[in-house]
Amino acid sequence: MMRVVVLGAAAGGGVPQWNCGCSVCRAAFADRDLRRTQASMAVSADGDHWFLINASPDLRQQVIATPQLHPKPGALRHSPIAGVILTNGEVDAVAGLLSMREGSPFAIYAHAKVLAILKANSIFNVLNEKLVSRRPIETDQRFEPTLPDGTLSGLDVVAFSVPGKGAWYLEGQAHPGGDAADGDTLGLTITDKATGQSIHVLTACARVTDDLKARLAGAPLVLFDGTVWRDDELITAGLGHKTGQAMGHIAMSGDEGAIAALGDLDIARKLFVHINNSNPVLLSCSAEREAAERAGWQVPADGTEVTL
């Protein structure tokens, strides 16, 4: 039985963002129920050993809020977190690794390109490589993460390339891991070996291709990029000068948006994650939320758990 916990459902900056006075953030400053931390998920085949999908800057807060990730009773030093699988090298995917520097063993699984980014930044040397192994993963190659003692996790993982872009802080620079598009943005298919049930996780996706549709069709659970409702959302709101596409994110709405593109794929359960604080879908009373839910999508709160 596979368990998935949404540790954080927001995009970079969280909800509310510390310096943002947009309508969603103002509402979230006033109402705790609207608040969301930056995107990360945890998945487990046995309920005892967990793998993070990305390490959010809010990781410590997320661990505190998630009993499944607490140290076991009676142990002086312990964590149920056995590893972290990175889907990209963005700040909001890797910064939480720095909160895991206190000496518990775990593994980092990432494309060689992302591992090169970590290696090039000496701040990540606080993660003792004798305890924190760095394991390269290749696209379209199945692997099974292991527990710190070498035991197999019971999860099969396949990473696949997704239309997107490289980390924004490397724009215009030579990338430590090379400039090829492969590895910049990954989706994950995670399968419980005992039951055969699979989930698909895409925290960033610029467009839905025919190949991606074929991969997601009939899935029991998809967690999908919900950064913006409209492609020009940040521009229209006066919050920025980039479209969603320019940032590597498909819009939820529109003829070519995620809701339309994934609407006829017979996906049993669809959750939006990595939702930007500009996105009105975060407001439960909004027309955008009503439209998303009518189309079969869920806007999860932090801590939402799904069992397959």
UniProtKB/Swiss-Prot annotation:
Keyword Transport applies: yes
Transmembrane segments: none
Pathway: Cofactor biosynthesis; pyrroloquinoline quinone biosynthesis
SUPFAM superfamilies: Metallo-hydrolase/oxidoreductase (SSF56281)
Pfam families the record matches: Lactamase_B_2
Superkingdom assignment: Bacteria
InterPro entries: Metallo-B-lactamas (IPR001279), PQQ_synth_PqqB (IPR011842), RibonucZ/Hydroxyglut_hydro (IPR036866)
Any GO BP annotation: pyrroloquinoline quinone biosynthetic process
Keywords: PQQ biosynthesis, Transport
Family affiliation: Belongs to the PqqB family.
NCBIfam families named in the record: PQQ_syn_pqqB (TIGR02108)
Main function: May be involved in the transport of PQQ or its precursor to the periplasm.
Protein name: Coenzyme PQQ synthesis protein B
Annotated source species: Rhodopseudomonas palustris (strain BisB5)
Lineage: Bacteria, Pseudomonadati, Pseudomonadota, Alphaproteobacteria, Hyphomicrobiales
Gene of this entry: pqqB
